[in-house]
Amino acid sequence: MSLIVFTGGARSGKSAAAQELAAARSRDGARVVVAVFGQPIDQEMQDRIERHRTDRPDHFETIEATEASSWVAAVPDGALLVVDCLGTLLGLLMDEEQEPDRVRPRFDELVGWIIRRPGDTIVVTNEVGEGVVPAYESGRVFRDILGRANRILANEADCAYLVVCGRLVDLTSMPRHAAWPSD
């Protein structure tokens, strides 16, 4: 069982990197299941969903979840799971649960399931917190919950990558704690 995390900004190439890795594993016989999240609420989002559909290899199985927790039961044990993307999953959960105090425990439960599930897992997530402080409470809650989940996943992951301009920065071997410089 391996856990691999791809984090980065919008349109950085996270999904492409995850799909490329999953495709390589599928050539070795792995069954690939991609869990995607989001509501086609407007034309831009519909176009985005369709673009992702056409980008995925035909032999990938896809779970298009419209509820934050419903997709978990549909994931076969032992399959290579690609979660694309954790930020969209959190947004879906925040739409379901209007109370921030109810969002965090449910999201923590989903993240815990991702970490513990049998089978290899690739997680695509959004890097948050490098911009201005969001003006609205919901934006701050989203940033805080996702930022914490990203840190937990990266610490648990066998490999973690920051994707910038289509390039991968391997975070796995980077220090997790600061140290004083040597004298």
Q: What are the roles of these predicted feature ranges?
A:
Residues 18, 52, 82, 126, ...:
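Residue-level signal for inorganic ion chemistry
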Residues 2-75:
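Conserved P-loop
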Residues 54, 58-105:
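Helix-adjacent hinge/juxtasegments
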Residues 2-6, 32, 79-88, 119-123:
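Generic beta-sheet signal
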Residues 38, 66, 86-87, 127-128, ...:
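Short, flexible active-site-adjacent loop segments at beta-strand->alpha-helix junctions, enriched
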Residues 1-10, 24, 29-35, 159-183:
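Charged, low-complexity C-terminal accessory regions
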Residues 30, 58-60, 79, 119, ...:
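A structural micro-motif
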